[in-house]
Amino acid sequence: MFSSSMFPHLILPAIGSSKVRTMVLPFAFVGFFIFPICLASLLDWNDAYEYPKYSFEWSNVSILEGDIDSIKEKTEKTKLSSLFYAGKHEYFCVYPNASLIKQNSTTEPSYDLQELRIQGTEKINELANVFLIENRGYWTYDYVYGQHVRQYHLEPQQGSDKVLANPMYILGTAPNTQTKKNLEENWAIGFVEGKAYLQTTFRNGTMCDITKRPRHVILSYECSTNSDTPEITQYQEVSSCAYSMTIHVPGLCSLPAFKIQEDIPSEKIVCYNVIKEKSNEVDHKDSQHVVDEVAQTSPPEVKEVETQSS
């Protein structure tokens, strides 16, 4: 089945109107109306800002079951296809080959990395007076720029308004990045689908009972949302007493290299109704024309179709 974390919003036909139109609905609502195709696993969708982005379309063009093999043979290598079922109905869906798209994307644009490092850390310095705190169930995490990252459990004290942090662990302390040499040594620049992020490591945390080594946390600073407020967007213990944390820095969004690429056009997922034989009750074009149209790189335009009001 689809996962709400994989498809937070899909563009789908509206229901209960005289015409089919496209609209954006929360997945929790549209999930009742979508057949169980496992496109989430096929497309490896992670979040709303993942690349490539997708839009979903129902086509009013029906295809003959006997034409499917021919369509598959003619489909561009940048596209994949699958058959799916919803009750008694069969659908043929054409969707992008996400692996090829990512392989062909520019993951490391040409930038002056040292200049990018300087510009980026200047924006991160704006967190100097910011205290970030994130509660994740039993544990709470906080980040203080230039100082540390901590993990602790907040325990209310009986008969008092005070809350005790017990236990508390320092996951890592900030390195010295004041000199140019330290700046280069302690700040790494990475790219994910052409978007830059800065990364550093806070070391010398509380000693770990399991590894017998000090805890450490890898911090990634990026423009990860459209929010004007800095926030901890991701946290994970990747191995015993080794952690990763991602922090959204609004200032980085003003730098082109770090900015979310919202203007990237979405890749289409188009599904067609499959029929056993030609019928006057459906909109079915000349068989060979349909084969060529469905197999082409750009799926056919979805038209407005008159429907009965429910």
Curated annotation (Swiss-Prot):
Segments for region (Disordered): 282-310
Source organism superkingdom: Eukaryota
S-S bonds: C208-C241, C223-C253
Bias type Basic and acidic residues, positions: 282-292, 301-310
GO cellular component, one term: endoplasmic reticulum lumen
Sites carrying sugar chains: N60, N97, N104, N204
Signal peptide per UniProt: 1-40
GO biological process assignments: endoplasmic reticulum unfolded protein response; retrograde protein transport, ER to cytosol
Residue numbers binding a mannooligosaccharide derivative: W139, Q151, D209, R215, E237, Y243
Keywords per UniProt: Disulfide bond, Endoplasmic reticulum, Glycoprotein, Lectin, Membrane, Signal
Membrane topology: Peripheral membrane protein
Subcellular localization: Endoplasmic reticulum membrane
GO MF annotation list: carbohydrate binding
Domain MRH: 129-255
Family: Belongs to the OS-9 family.
Role of this protein: Lectin involved in the quality control of the secretory pathway. As a member of the endoplasmic reticulum-associated degradation lumenal (ERAD-L) surveillance system, targets misfolded endoplasmic reticulum lumenal glycoproteins for degradation.
Subunit structure: Interacts with missfolded ER lumenal proteins.
Entry protein name: Protein OS-9 homolog
Gene label: yos9
